[in-house]
From Swiss-Prot:
Its main location: plastid. The keyword Chloroplast applies. GO terms for biological process: photosynthesis. HAMAP family: PSII_PsbK. This is Photosystem II reaction center protein K. The chain crosses the membrane at residues 36-56. One of the components of the core complex of photosystem II (PSII). PSII is a light-driven water:plastoquinone oxidoreductase that uses light energy to abstract electrons from H(2)O, generating O(2) and a proton gradient subsequently used for ATP formation. It consists of a core antenna complex that captures photons, and an electron transfer chain that converts photonic excitation into a charge separation. It is a single-pass membrane protein.
Length: 61
């Protein structure tokens, strides 16, 4: 469990302090997709939270 936590911390650290992460832009033809692209990194976290809600619904069998 500690290794997973360390991996998550490393990933968050690399995202927050990566200069190329904030300077990347979509081409003009796809500029209308910017709001969707901004939300996309959160989607895996929603699935992770859904797993806990599902387990709570079935009483953590």
């Amino acid at each position: 469990m500690l290794n997973i936590f360390n991996l998550v911390c490393i990933c968050i650290h690399s995202v927050l302090y990566s200069s190329s992460f904030f300077s990347a832009k979509l081409p003009e033809a796809y500029a209308f997709l910017n709001p969707i692209v901004d939300i996309m990194p959160v989607i895996p976290l929603l699935f992770f939270l859904l797993a806990f809600v599902w387990q709570a619904a079935v009483s953590f069998r």
